[in-house]
């Protein structure tokens, strides 16, 4: 985070209970925003409480998932035995995998590009979305081409997708932060 320009915006998807919101918000200077996304009802409410308790005014928390296109999806919020998944809740891409007894939520899906728009400068996209990272990045490609942000993902997109979409822009995997992979744009300027 220390190498991320404090004057630019951060996109943070998969907020869980909002534990990253205070440090992300406090790392931004005046005018810079944290665009946070959490699709699960309980986790979204917990993130709202975290924002309130910490007086975070530069965070825009959206009750939705990020994906490749706007729409709806099914979020599995418990395992088949009914045990809550918490931060491990995940989008079910194949609806034939919906399991009786498991708690699922219908959630809104938005794209990063449609929410952020062209007037903001994004310096970091941080995705902890339980295997849905590639879909979220697909919906952020205009922002990525325009801003060349640092990208931090829990799960890497598949190799072909990386080669077709991020490698031509100058992105390389340059490190790890715990289990997350760091993708940095090296030597290719952002488009205007």
Q: Across the structure, where does each feature detected by a protein language model lie?
A:
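SAM cofactor-binding core of SAM-dependent methyltransferases
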Residues: 1-69
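Generic beta-structure capping elements
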Residues: 4, 78-80, 186
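Conserved acidic-Pro-Pro-aromatic motif
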Residues: 8-9, 21, 25-36, 111-192
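Conserved phosphate-coordination/catalytic loops
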Residues: 15, 103-110, 131-134
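Acceptor-substrate binding/catalytic loop of class I
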Residues: 42, 102-106, 152-157
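Short, hinge-like loop/turn segments at secondary-structure boundaries
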Residues: 52-54, 76-81, 163-171
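Glycine-rich adenosyl-binding loop in Rossmann-like folds that engage adenosine-containing cofactors
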Residues: 57, 62-119
